[in-house]
Amino acid sequence: MEFNIPEEKNMASSDTKKMKTVDMAYIALFAVIMAVCSWISIPAVVPFTLQTFGVFVAVAVLGGKRGTLAVALYLLMGVVGLPVFSGFSGGLGRLLGSTGGYIVGFVFSALVMWLMEHFFGTRTWVLALSMVLGLVVCYAFGTAWFLIVYARTTGPIGLWTALGWCVFPYIIPDLIKIALALAIRKRLASAIRVR
């Protein structure tokens, strides 16, 4: 006995597969964009990079789910040893170092943005607020990690010292990155229809 599948259903299935393929391509592309952003680096206690900008753009353009997957893929690429972190470095050791908490914090930052999108929508002010909250979460996780690792390897330091080294110098540049990511979103979101 032969079953004929209506042409319409066949096309819908093809469109779904195509959309998933397109989604995966965009997720991979934005993971690579984050890697390129990390290579643009100014050495410091916590290197000044454009990684947070890459995270913001990925979530803003791709949406919460796909953006978070792009950030997770970027992190996974680094864990397996690809040189995607600042200074063309990679490997688990980089994440276990004193500044690794900020890199892991990118995933938490993206998750915050995804949750905000899920509950409050994709209006620009919601996205801007979610980026700021995500940044605060990244700062908090990264600084806590830094304090623990630094205390084990060098000796204990105070919270204000850690914030002075790792957070305060980056606040204004990170807010500028948020503004730029929002501007880029307006340009790219209509061209990249993956939501």
Predicted regions and their residues:
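Helix-boundary and loop/linker segments of multi-pass membrane transporters
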Residues: 16-20, 44-45, 86-87, 92, ...
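Peri-membrane helix termini and adjoining interfacial loops of integral membrane proteins
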Residues: 3-5, 78-84, 150-160
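Membrane-embedded alpha-helical hairpins and interfacial helices in multi-pass inner-membrane proteins
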Residues: 122-195
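Hydrophobic transmembrane alpha-helices
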Residues: 2-70, 80
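Alpha-helical membrane-inserting segments
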Residues: 33, 37, 41, 58, ...
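Hydrophobic alpha-helical transmembrane segments
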Residues: 24-29, 53, 57, 67-73, ...
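Short helix-perturbing small/polar motifs within transmembrane alpha-helices
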Residues: 3-14, 29, 36, 92-140
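Interfacial aromatic-anchored transmembrane helix boundaries in multi-pass membrane proteins
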Residues: 38-50, 75-109
